[in-house]
């Protein structure tokens, strides 16, 4: 495999800072060297954090992102920094979850992408947000996201 696909990466292997906002965060991508194969890639962020836009209090979620790559793969450090940039970003759970998915779809042009946002309770109610870009490509194994429904201490 040629190292040329990595030459434009600016964040991996270097010193980086956490972006101040999702808008400032720079996602990076590399050409998919297995673009002729349909396969699933999963990223799990069990400690995702954002802020309530009304109270400024922290909100926490377990995010699971599955995608079937097209021509591009997301570079994982840039994804981590993008997700971390939400820690000082005020938005409702639904907006955070869908904004992440749409940004990835626009940037990567995947064959398919889905996101599950499993938000921990605020005010006693957990909010789960699910979205996918279309029908799962035929022949691709997409495992269950593996996040059980919230049960509290029960």
Swiss-Prot record:
It catalyses: 7-aminomethyl-7-carbaguanine + 2 NADP(+) = 7-cyano-7-deazaguanine + 2 NADPH + 3 H(+). SUPFAM superfamilies: Tetrahydrobiopterin biosynthesis enzymes-like (SSF55620). Its main location: cytoplasm. Keywords: Cytoplasm, NADP, Oxidoreductase, Queuosine biosynthesis. It is an enzyme of class 1 (oxidoreductase). Substrate binds at residues 74-76, 93-94. The active site is at residues 52, 59. GO terms for molecular function: preQ1 synthase activity. It is found in: Cytoplasm. One of its GO terms (cellular component) is cytoplasm. Pathway: tRNA modification; tRNA-queuosine biosynthesis. Its EC number is 1.7.1.13. One of its GO terms (biological process) is queuosine biosynthetic process. InterPro entries: GTP-CH-I_C/QueF (IPR043133), NADPH_dep_7-cyano-7-deazaG_red (IPR050084), QueF (IPR029500), QueF_type1 (IPR016856). Catalyzes the NADPH-dependent reduction of 7-cyano-7-deazaguanine (preQ0) to 7-aminomethyl-7-deazaguanine (preQ1). Belongs to the GTP cyclohydrolase I family. QueF type 1 subfamily. This is NADPH-dependent 7-cyano-7-deazaguanine reductase. The lineage of its organism: Bacteria, Pseudomonadati, Pseudomonadota, Alphaproteobacteria, Rhodobacterales. The gene is queF.
């Amino acid at each position: 495999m040629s190292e040329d696909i990595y030459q434009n990466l600016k964040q991996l292997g270097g010193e980086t800072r956490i972006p101040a906002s999702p808008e400032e965060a720079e996602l990076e991508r590399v050409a998919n060297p297995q673009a002729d194969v349909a396969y699933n890639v999963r990223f799990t962020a069990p400690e995702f954090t954002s802020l309530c836009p009304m109270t400024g209090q922290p909100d926490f979620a377990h995010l699971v992102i599955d995608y079937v790559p097209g021509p591009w793969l997301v570079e994982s450090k840039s994804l981590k920094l993008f997700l971390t940039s939400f820690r000082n970003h005020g938005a409702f759970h639904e907006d955070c979850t869908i904004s992440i998915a749409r940004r990835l779809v626009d940037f990567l042009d995947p064959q398919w992408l889905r996101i599950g946002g499993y938000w921990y309770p605020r005010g006693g109610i957990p909010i789960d947000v699910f979205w996918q870009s279309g029908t799962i490509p035929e022949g691709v194994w997409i495992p269950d996201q593996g996040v059980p429904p919230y049960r509290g201490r029960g």
